[in-house]
């Protein structure tokens, strides 16, 4: 079942944030420290922000199996960009012990439906090129590159 995250979910969300960070740290230790993206206190603030919904997949015991952090974005009165509403996926993770059960696909589908229900034009996300499994997952969901970030390490 997919539902909105609640304060009681923060400990498990924190564990999953650490799993994501470890993948990023292993792929790009020059950029990512070992840790997690948000503290428990920051998560409490995010949970109250209607512009930053967090969807969670839970099992029959209401235990979190995965999450999808979202952010509503909209450029208004921009000289170049059109005024469209976007749902940006800031982070999507399924517990590494539960992968392969289509939980990620269910979370992504719920995010798409949530975006539609909220009048969004599109859904976007960023994925690090070192995270090949995530890239394959998003491609299997039908996402295509919108823009490409490039770098040269000096």
Predicted features and spans:
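A short beta-loop-alpha structural element at the N-terminal edge
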Residues: 1-15
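Conserved GNAT-fold acetyl-CoA-binding loop/helix
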Residues: 22-43
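Conserved active-site alpha-helix within GNAT-family acetyltransferase domains
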Residues: 105, 109, 117, 129-147
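Conserved acetyl-CoA-binding loop-helix of GNAT-fold acetyltransferases
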Residues: 91-94, 100-113, 140
């Amino acid at each position: 079942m997919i539902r909105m995250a609640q304060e009681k979910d923060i400990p498990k969300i924190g564990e999953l944030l650490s799993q994501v960070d470890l993948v990023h740290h292993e792929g790009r230790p020059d950029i990512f420290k070992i840790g997690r993206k948000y503290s428990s206190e920051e998560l409490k603030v995010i949970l109250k922000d209607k512009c930053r919904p967090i969807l969670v997949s839970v099992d029959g015991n209401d235990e979190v199996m995965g999450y999808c952090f979202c952010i509503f974005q909209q450029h208004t009165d921009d000289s170049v960009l059109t005024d469209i509403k976007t749902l940006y996926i800031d982070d999507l993770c399924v517990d590494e012990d539960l992968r392969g059960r289509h939980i990620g696909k269910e979370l992504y589908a719920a995010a798409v439906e949530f975006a539609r229900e909220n009048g969004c034009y599109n859904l976007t996300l960023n994925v690090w090129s070192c995270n090949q499994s995530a890239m394959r997952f998003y491609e299997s969901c039908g996402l295509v590159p919108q823009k490409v970030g490039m770098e040269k390490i000096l």
